[in-house]
């Protein structure tokens, strides 16, 4: 996390999901105590952050985080079991470090992101879902009680979340 002031407000940017998975309750409580807004930089959570600014929470039916399915999408467990580390590191859409690429290939990353979303947005676990969107263009979906769906879409790039987090342009 890094902290800055902008227009009289205090912001923290969060790029490490593991800290929120383990200490999310405490981190969020500290942010609330210090009147600090935590701004996620991860693409899925940034897309939820921007979308939830305009949605009344009581209108939410379901929230979807998207996953590309990684290099093993569509394979059986037997086929995956026989894959090499090198094959797991060959993500079809994202250029990431080794740890997150392996976490993505095994979907562990998506499990972390569900916990992260619960903490960041005070969402009940039963609202949270994962859907495979192989092109990595849809970053999150919010289904409303009236049946409509809000989608946050962009090319698979971290440029928008990073630019927002670094510049603190207010959405």
What residue ranges belong to the model's regions?
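Conserved anion/nucleotide-ligand pocket segment
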Residues: 51-109
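Short acidic, glycine/serine/threonine-rich loops at helix termini
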Residues: 24-27, 50-54, 74-79, 140-144, ...
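General beta-strand structural signal in soluble alpha/beta enzymes
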Residues: 13-15, 37-42, 65, 130-132
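Short, ordered loop/turn segments at secondary-structure junctions
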Residues: 16-20, 43-46
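Rossmann-like dinucleotide-binding domain that binds NAD(P)(H)
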Residues: 95-137
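Single conserved hydrophobic/aromatic residue that forms the stacking wall/gate
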Residues: 1-11, 169-170
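Rossmann-fold NAD(P)-binding glycine/threonine-rich loop
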Residues: 17-36
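C-terminal substrate-binding/catalytic lobe of Rossmann-fold NAD(P)-dependent dehydrogenases
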Residues: 121-130, 134-168
